[in-house]
């Protein structure tokens, strides 16, 4: 998220392709969105599932085992990178992946990021629709990640923890009738329906991206604008002088945030919250700003990020139209 939209623009200008990796969830979600729009449906929400409880935002590489041991059969802890896996658990990975989807599809984040509502795969259309229609979303046209765990800690049956989904709206009585007749997992009103993929295979399907780029000059999902960012958010009360340890560490997690808010408030992108020292205290749950850390303005990653902020200083500057 630090510079993806800028890199995609550079690749296109050079005649190349900048692509999400097929097989990982963001590219699969982009395919869901493309399918829905090409078929003439309005995309209400798109996203994935994960294992989530609110206290996971405070998890760290030392105590993440308490979570991992509940659902993974780990025979040798040395085979696991706890910092990496902690980023999967603490909400960071979900924020990164849903931001990638927003920047590639034209969907937008909710104003307070992801809410992780528990949902079975059969409840997607009931849960992932606007609150005004009885769902959990603040509006249509957003991303959301559903949880495979209820807030009381019990597992959700028929969850989508490894899968992806899209929720669509039927604009006609005929479409809504088809949702029911063809078992498109409609909500109780019949107005909304869902399509899901139960699994993703990560790198095992990457060859599809390579073939698509090489043979058709077509990415399997790529940024078209800067709509969503991932900002460093304090896992606990942080003290001035502490050294931040980045994604999956002890200090911060990555929260999906509308890009215009990130730019307006000068929020610190998660990708640059590593090996930088805090200049002031930050309360637990607080979003860090550039001014809160002692960063090197000459660092190459910082320079590229600042270049992207200048290029996309207004929402969707340079964005291609999303059909």
Regions found by a protein language model. Name each.
Residues 4-7, 32, 98:
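Aromatic/hydrophobic pocket-lining residues that form π-stacking "cages" and hydrophobic walls in ligand
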Residues 1, 23-25, 48-49, 249, ...:
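Short, ordered loop/turn segments at secondary-structure junctions
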Residues 13-16, 38-41, 240, 284:
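Short coil/turn connectors at secondary-structure junctions
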Residues 12, 23-87:
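Rossmann-like NAD(P)H-binding beta-loop-alpha module
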Residues 1-17, 21-24:
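Rossmann-fold NAD(P)-binding glycine/threonine-rich loop
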Residues 3-5, 28-29, 54, 120-121, ...:
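Short secondary-structure boundary/hinge segments and terminal tails
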Residues 64-323:
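C-terminal catalytic/substrate-binding lobe primarily of soluble NAD(P)-dependent oxidoreductases
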